Structures are given as C-alpha cells and as structure tokens.
Amino acid sequence: MNWLNQHKKAIILAASAAVFTAIMIFLATGKNKEPVKQAVPTETENTVVKQEANNDESNETIVIDIKGAVQHPGVYEMRTGDRVSQAIEKAGGTSEQADEAQVNLAEILQDGTVVYIPKKGEETAVQQGGGGSVQSDGGKGALVNINTATLEELQGISGVGPSKAEAIIAYREENGRFQTIEDITKVSGIGEKSFEKIKSSITVK
C-alpha cells in the first residue's frame, strides 16, 4: 500500500503515456488508409455493352417469303435488320424479267412478310409495307398492311378517307397491332359495311 502511494504519480504518468501513444498510432494508421473506390464503368465498357446488345438483336432470325421474278422463289431465313436486296441475293438474284424499279431494295425486312418482285410490264400497284415487305396478291394489286401503313397508304384504300385513316393510326398507337383484319371494325367510323368494302385490300402481315 505504501509502495502504491509512493509510486502513484509514476503509474498515472505511465498509463497516460500509454493511452496517448495508442491514440497517436490509431490516428496515424487511419490517415494511411485509402478510401475504398467504387468501380465506375468507363465509356469504353459502356460502348462494348451496347454493341453486344445490338449484336444480340441483329442475330435474331426472321422468316420471309420471296416471290415473283427471282431465280429461286421460296421461304428463307434472314436476320433482323436485313434488307430487301439481301433477300433477293439469297434467292439467287433477280431474273431477266424483273422490274427492280418498282422495288425498294433498301427496305428493312420484317418477320413473316412477303417480298414480291414484279416482272417488266406487269401491271401491279405494288406498295411498300412499312416493315420491309413488298406485298402482292397475284397481280390484282398490293395488299395494304394496316399495322405498318402510313397515312397516305391507308388513304389509298378504296373507301378510306383522311378521317378514317387517322382513326386507324390512332387506334394502332393506342392499342397496338391488329391481330386480324376483322379487328379494324373496332376503329371508330369503320363498321361492317365499310369492312366488306376494304377487306380484300388489307392485311395484318
């Protein structure tokens, strides 16, 4: 007990020194630690990811039916983004009778569409569908795809004026694609009588 009293100050000083030393070591160690940096994707990495996504989309297979003045008419598998010119090439090219002036070779193909290459002198009102199809009903005139047709193309249908054409596009934008040609009767202003007049001129594919 006497020893503790005699050395009390020394013990307190030693303890204080130890605590002070520990604090200094802790502070020094904390300063040397670098903050953890979160990995941020670089612009190059983002570009690579976008390119891979685009490649996946372009690798999707579609099926088209090419008819008319080509070497090998038939059903062919194509890739998303392919154009009419590529479909013609896959069918062996056009025949000597082909009238390419009536065909939009740069048009993009859609799955399930018909590409028709007319012959020279053939009287067909060939119309280019918005999705890359060149559709024809055997020389009697082209069918208008009501899912892709523009305002002008819709007005080209006998019995469809500007107001009905606008109504068709408005319905399409609000409700999506027409599943059957009969669905057009759901459009305001187009009843059964109107449908009977236009059904032979329209398609949904």
From Swiss-Prot:
Cited InterPro entries: Competence_ComE, Competence_ComEA_HhH, Endo/Exo/Phosphatase_dom_1, Hlx-hairpin-Hlx_DNA-bd_motif, RuvA_2-like, Soluble_ligand-bd
Expression induction or repression: Expression activated by ComK.
Main localization, broad class: membrane
Compartments where located: Cell membrane
Species: Bacillus subtilis (strain 168)
Residues exposed to the Extracellular side: 29-205
Membrane topology, record value: Single-pass type II membrane protein
Stretches assigned to the HhH domain: 142-171, 172-201
GO cellular component: plasma membrane; type II protein secretion system complex
Pfam families according to UniProt: HHH_3, SLBB
Bilayer-crossing regions: 10-28
Gene Ontology biological process terms, A to Z: DNA repair; establishment of competence for transformation; protein secretion by the type II secretion system
GO molecular function: DNA binding
Highest taxon of source: Bacteria
Residues in the Cytoplasmic compartment per record: 1-9
Function according to Swiss-Prot or TrEMBL: Needed for both DNA binding and transport. It is absolutely required for the uptake of transforming DNA but not for binding. Its role in binding may be indirect.
NCBIfam families according to UniProt: comE (TIGR01259), competence protein ComEA helix-hairpin-helix repeat region (TIGR00426)
Keywords: Cell membrane, Competence, Membrane, Repeat, Transmembrane, Transmembrane helix
Name the record gives this protein: ComE operon protein 1
